[in-house]
Amino acid sequence: MKVGIVIYSNDPETVWNAFRFGNYAVKEGETVQVFLIGKGVESESLDTWAFKITGQMRSFVEGGGAIAACETCLTIHHLGGSEQRWHIRRRGHAPRAAPR
């Protein structure tokens, strides 16, 4: 099964739980893609003492998950040049289907 997760929030708990779900699905053998849009493109900067989001993101990508982000949203939120975004594919306004 293919699973798509859209993250439109910059609430640390919400984003952390979305990536936890993504990690679970990847471990179950599902093909999973996360699409960051709107405030969701801020995900890498939302770590707190309780919610280690970048750790969840790293596990997700290392497990085979894919992360894409709205390029326009990255620009609006001034996040286009971050070196930490090595694992985020830039997309237009909508994600494309993952190759088979």
Across the structure, where does each feature detected by a protein language model lie?
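Short coil/turn connectors at secondary-structure junctions
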Residues: M1-V3, E28-V32, G64-G65
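Short, glycine-rich nucleotide/cofactor-binding loops
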Residues: V3-V15, V41-T48
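Conserved active-site and cofactor/substrate-binding residues in soluble primary-metabolism enzymes
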Residues: E13-N17, K52-G55
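Histidine-anchored nucleotide/phosphate-binding helix
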Residues: V15-K27
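Short internal beta-strands
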Residues: G22, V32-I37, I67-C73
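Small/aliphatic-rich secondary-structure junction motif
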Residues: V26-Q33, I37-E44
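Mid-chain, well-packed structural core segment of small domains
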Residues: W49, I53-G92
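Low-complexity intrinsically disordered segments
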Residues: R96-A98
